[in-house]
């Protein structure tokens, strides 16, 4: 019977550690959601390794809401909407974008992201493909690599 007490104590410690880790992840998600929130202008865009002209990239804005909803606008017209799931505890940080409106409705793209000062970099794989491991876009990997700057209100 004495063996049960140490085992129970070990389980209690393990459960407490898992809860603390979950709390840390929730806190990190909340912090990054706050960073994501707002309107962002694309300043650099590469698709399949092809860099878009700066003036074309700057026609695109992304509006992120605190709850993870987002919209992509081109010259002020919404071309896609969706939801996002982020995990800022991963290295690199991960994002899953699910399209709810637009050409790719119902599809999910896996990606990675990082923040700079008033900027963020995102690299996304085509829907159904593996998550990028690094921030790169080539003809072979088919990734979209974008740098966005926060727009001032």
Give names to the regions the model predicted.
Residues 1-153:
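Low-complexity, Gly/Pro
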């Amino acid at each position: 019977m004495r063996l049960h007490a140490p085992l129970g104590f070990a389980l209690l410690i393990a459960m407490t550690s898992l809860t603390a880790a979950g709390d840390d992840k929730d806190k990190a998600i909340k912090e990054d959601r706050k960073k994501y929130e707002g309107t962002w202008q694309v300043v650099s865009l590469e698709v399949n390794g092809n860099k878009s002209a700066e003036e074309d990239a700057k026609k695109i804005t992304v509006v992120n809401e605190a709850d993870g909803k987002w919209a992509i606008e081109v010259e002020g017209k919404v071309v896609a909407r969706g939801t996002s799931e982020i995990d800022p505890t991963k290295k690199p940080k991960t994002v899953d974008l699910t399209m709810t409106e637009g050409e790719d409705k119902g599809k999910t793209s896996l990606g990675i992201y990082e923040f700079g000062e008033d900027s963020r970099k995102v690299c996304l794989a085509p829907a159904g493909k593996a998550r990028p491991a690094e921030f790169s876009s080539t003809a072979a990997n088919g990734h979209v690599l974008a740098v966005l700057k926060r727009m001032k209100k």
